[in-house]
A protein has these predicted regions:
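Iron-sulfur-associated redox domains of electron-transfer enzymes in respiratory
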Residues: 64-181
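Iron-sulfur cluster-binding cysteine motifs and their immediate structural context
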Residues: 2-14, 18-43, 47, 51-66
């Protein structure tokens, strides 16, 4: 499948689907079809952007996630916390308060993805400087930070794959660092 992940975070509740086609017209990669009055996701086309979840008036689509209680099943329950997590709360809660709440929920360690941002930014800047020094430098260069954008390019615009910045995202750098521990 062109290196595209086979795991999909969007699923359907058939009993809620009314076949209204709103999700079909909203899907940026045309990954939804209606058969027998029910929507079906074409997994090989889905980029997991979540747009169908957002627009479905019947809440027939949902994001697959693990129950928070499953954290207890792991010896090492590590969370990679994106910067946006900390902005979701009232300013009276510090990062330390939020991290402590995550630990209280059962996570054994909290890693902040933002800690890898400076290193990735430097690597990206160095790559771009070197790249644009070349006479026939490929343009535009597209950020590789968003998994949905990467899947969109792989599925819908494969001719743009070579335009993706070949530097891993801060989230991927954080995940690799944690795996190496």
């Amino acid at each position: 499948m062109n290196g595209i992940s086979e795991y999909h975070s969007v699923e359907l509740k058939d009993e809620r689907c009314k076949g209204c086609t709103i999700c079909i017209t909203s899907c940026p990669v045309e990954a939804i079809r209606v058969h027998n009055g029910k929507a079906h996701i074409l997994e090989e086309k889905c980029i997991d952007c979540g747009e169908c979840i957002r627009v479905c008036p019947n809440r027939a689509k949902y994001a697959v996630s693990n129950a928070l209680s499953e954290v207890q099943n792991y010896k090492k329950a590590i969370i990679l916390a994106p910067p946006t997590l900390f902005t979701q709360f009232n300013e009276r809660f510090s990062k330390q308060d939020i991290e402590q709440a995550l630990l209280n929920l059962g996570f054994t360690k909290v890693y902040q993805i933002a800690d890898n941002t400076a290193e990735i930014t430097k690597a990206s800047a160095a790559w771009l400087r070197h790249h644009f020094e070349q006479e026939k430098a490929l343009r535009p260069i597209i950020s590789s930070n968003c998994p949905a954008v990467i899947k969109l390019i792989q599925v819908r615009f494969p001719s743009l794959i070579e335009h993706l910045l070949p530097i891993i995202s801060p989230a991927e750098a954080c995940a690799r660092e944690v795996r190496s521990l």
